[in-house]
């Protein structure tokens, strides 16, 4: 049965084109369109769509207000369309905090010119959000309660890469991988649905860590906010965050996290020397590498090859960390589409690093975490509600 979609936008052109694109996919069906947030709230209650696409700036009622009302009364997966501006980034983050699950840049030229990748991406995102049941987390931030959802593994966010990942990682400016380090092992035959580890079952390893890595995609802004706001100002290690996000969005996201967290959060800059208690967010549209500099680490921001599906790419950063810090790394893969992070995590594990994944039930999209959990790369699958406590418990021994 096709996933029922409600399209909300005050632009008649955008409503028509989004509806056409959605209806091109036999697994999707537009059941109605709305011209403002007020109509969206009413139609969500009446029609019970499985996914809503939502504009932000609309008359009568804006998209953010509509998201709040829908999530309060008829919780539904919502995909926001956002302009690639500083104000657009801030508004999108507000919408995600209000309960929207994902966003896409609102590019009229892509929609108008029938760009295949833009069409496929929209269809994939809607299908990923439509394959889920409700999951209610405890309060995700000091200021709001956000909904999370469960889903089956979703398709990648973009088309199939032109070259194997091993060669694409090797083509970055810092050698980070060998073909043998990417080979499939017996761990790849592990269960596709690992059980969730309780806090009591996670025993601190006593390892002396030097770095915490967190990689994520769809659902990541809310998940990162929940985890990082629980960290004390004196968290003992540097933190590197890799979130799939456009270049216009990462400065605003880093600034928002910095205002909410006790630790310092900043967008990573080329040459940054990593400090304990500071989180460095990979800049959108670039690749973030980690290099060893004495007893600490230094960050290198590069443009990277165009053949990588993601900028920033979790695999790239994880792989560079395996070379720079070896086993002295705790790496966590949170909610996200696709499998970015799996091969980088495999490299980290091969040198003795600790890998954890978010559990299926608390993910917005169980793609990236499943990629490391089902292959046996991660040692624990942990609920988002327990992730910060688990990280602090493990880090305290470092």
From Swiss-Prot:
It comes from the Bacteria. Residues 4-121 form the Response regulatory domain. The modification 4-aspartylphosphate is found at residue 55. It catalyses: [protein]-L-glutamate 5-O-methyl ester + H2O = L-glutamyl-[protein] + methanol + H(+); L-glutaminyl-[protein] + H2O = L-glutamyl-[protein] + NH4(+). Keywords: Chemotaxis, Cytoplasm, Hydrolase, Phosphoprotein. GO terms for cellular component: cytoplasm. One of its GO terms (biological process) is chemotaxis. It holds the Pfam family Response_reg. GO terms for molecular function: phosphorelay response regulator activity; protein-glutamate methylesterase activity; protein-glutamine glutaminase activity. Belongs to the CheB family. Contains a C-terminal catalytic domain, and an N-terminal region which modulates catalytic activity. Involved in chemotaxis. Part of a chemotaxis signal transduction system that modulates chemotaxis in response to various stimuli. Catalyzes the demethylation of specific methylglutamate residues introduced into the chemoreceptors (methyl-accepting chemotaxis proteins or MCP) by CheR. Also mediates the irreversible deamidation of specific glutamine residues to glutamic acid. NCBIfam families: PRK00742.1. This is Protein-glutamate methylesterase/protein-glutamine glutaminase. It comes from Shewanella frigidimarina (strain NCIMB 400).
